[in-house]
Structure formats: C-alpha cells, structure tokens
A protein has these predicted regions:
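Hydrophobic/aromatic residues positioned on beta-strands within the core alpha/beta folds
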Residues: 98, 255-257
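CheY-like receiver
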Residues: 138-192, 296-322
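Acidic catalytic/metal-coordinating carboxylates
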Residues: 51-52, 78-81, 236-240
Length: 322
C-alpha cells in the first residue's frame, strides 16, 4: 500500500549498500573540495560532487539520491530552479540550500521550491554542513519508517483476519472497520483542526481550499489543541508563540512574505518550523498543500494507533476462543 505523500520513497533501499547518497553542487572548486572532504569522512555517505545544475540533472536522471546540497548562485540554472526540478524528478529527495548572500527572498524561494534547510556561507563551523545533512537524512528516514510501518500494519491486519476466522463476530467486525478506516486515512487523511494567527488572507485561502479554519489570537489556549497552527512572521508575538507550541500537539507553519525579516526566517529554520513563502503568485497553492500534508500525516498516525488497539483486541479474542 503506497502512501500518497511518499511516492517513490525508499525505492533505492535495495541498491546493495547501507550508505546514503548525497549530491553536492557548487561552482567554486575550493568550496566543493572542502565540502566533499568533510562529508567523505562519514563512512556511510557516498558523495557525488558536480560544478553545475546541468551536471546534477544528468546524475538525477540515472541515480537516486537521498540529499541534494546546492549553492544558490550557479552558472546557468540557479540553485532554486535546480531544487524545484530535482524534487519533481525525485519527490522523496531532501534538499539543502547554501548561499553567501542570504536574503528573505532567497530563503522563501528556496523553501517554495522544496528545500527543507538553508545554510549561510561562510560556515562558522564546518561541522554545520555535516549536521544539516544528517538532519536531512533523519527526516527522510522518518518518512520511510512511517511508510513501511503503514504497510506492515495493514499486512498484519489482513493476515490476522484471515487466520482468525473463528474469532467472535464482534471482534471481526471491529477489526475490519478499523482496517477500512486506516486505508481511508492513508488515501484521504487530510481532515483536522486548523488555527490561523494574524492572517485573514491565510484564513480565506484555506477556507477556499475546503479546510475548516478558525482564526485565533496568539494567547488563545485553543491553539494547543489544534492539529496545525499557521502564524505569520508579521505578528509581533510569533517568536513566543512558536516556542510555546514547540514540542506540543500542533504542527506549526510559519507564513513569510517578501518583506519578512531574514533573522526571523533563519530562526524559524533553526526551530524546525515548516516555512511557507507567502505573497507569491503560487501562495494559494503552497499553503493548502503544506497544511494538507501535515493533516494527512496526523490522520495516518491516529488511524494507526486505533488499528493497533483493534489488532490487540482481536488477538485476545482469538486466544480466548482457543
């Protein structure tokens, strides 16, 4: 059973090596050499260095990579365009942008293209690059584990139903119901509660996309019970709100317009917040897609918990019958 948000995920797992593959793109030979040397120290990383986006695309056509690390300013196709094309070719790819000329616009553009992290050169500590690559690999591994867990859970339920034909009818019906609910959540699990702080425009965009949305003030205790909280960088209390919600129930999405403060965006990246560039022509698509993805992940997790409980109950009913 393929999860709709993990198309192509993990297809290279059987390639005969436990190493992760990193595609490194920079047109400065010295920088490229330093980065390659740093990452090559990791025994479980295979690094492929190239000097242009065009060279990177050739490799992406023939090989599956786990992480793309690219400079923003490249000859020919730029880093932002490369990330967008690479993610189109390999949707499971994690992408990290590197630049010596950071700006709010470049951060927003990188994340809109599909980047999940951002590094400003020169590195204060060369280990930053290694840490960012490791974090990207962990994010990808978590998605693979979620996908594999979903498949295994559905397989177990189907096998148990077949093996436990003599189980009491109520137990059979309960497990079949939860299995159907689980499969439904995998296919269409993008329902849940969404709260927006400080952006009437975001409320409208999400409602137009058929989400149930409530607009709340930043101090509202209801925020902690929401599934997804959308907050705008223009809200003066966004730092406090983000820190309060970190580690709590909601997923936090930060809206950032072209006039967003660069330090705010870099702090949001440090806090591992989901960042959405707003005020762009494609904003009406990007925000609903991000919220839909987060709600789908949550819906699957909840359905998996219910199915686990139903499996345990069914096993107990079989044991009692025998």
């Amino acid at each position: 059973m393929d999860l709709p948000f993990e198309t192509g995920e993990g297809e290279g797992e059987g390639r005969g090596t436990l190493a992760s593959k990193v595609l490194l793109v920079d047109d400065e030979p010295v920088v490229l050499d330093i980065c390659v040397r740093l990452l090559a120290r990791e025994a479980d990383l295979i690094v492929s260095p190239v000097g242009s986006a065009e060279e990177a695309l050739v490799l992406l056509k023939d090989q599956r990579f786990d992480v793309l690390v690219t400079d923003k300013n490249l000859p020919g196709m730029g880093g932002v365009e490369l990330i967008a094309e690479a993610r189109r070719m390999q949707p499971a790819l994690e992408a990290v942008m590197i630049t010596a000329y950071a700006s709010s616009e470049s951060v927003i553009a990188a994340f809109a293209a599909g980047a999940s992290d951002y590094i400003v050169k020169p590195f204060d500590d060369l280990r930053v690059l290694r840490a960012k690559v490791r974090a990207a690999l962990e994010r990808r591994s978590e998605r693979v584990r979620t996908r594999d867990g979903a498949r295994e859970m559905a397989r177990q339920a189907a096998a148990l139903l077949d093996a436990g034909r003599d189980a009491p009818e109520p137990a059979h019906e309960a497990l079949e119901t939860e299995l159907r609910n689980y499969e439904q959540a995998v296919r269409m699990g993008h329902t849940g509660s969404v709260a927006v702080v400080g952006s009437a425009e975001a409320v409208k965009v999400l409602r137009d996309a058929a989400f149930e949305v409530v607009e709340l003030p930043p101090y509202s205790p209801q925020l902690e019970s929401a599934d997804v909280v959308v907050v705008e960088t223009g809200d003066p209390q966004w730092h406090t709100l983000a820190e309060r919600l970190q580690g709590r129930s909601p997923d936090v999405v930060l809206l950032a317009g072209a006039d967003a403060d660069l330090s705010d965006l870099l702090e949001a990246i440090t806090l591992r917040m989901d960042l959405v560039g707003y005020g762009q022509s494609n904003a009406a698509r990007i925000l609903p897609e991000k919220v839909r993805m987060l709600l789908m992940r949550r819906g699957i997790q909840r359905a998996q918990q219910r199915l686990t409980a139903a499996l345990d109950t069914f096993r107990q009913s079989i044991a009692t019958t025998n």
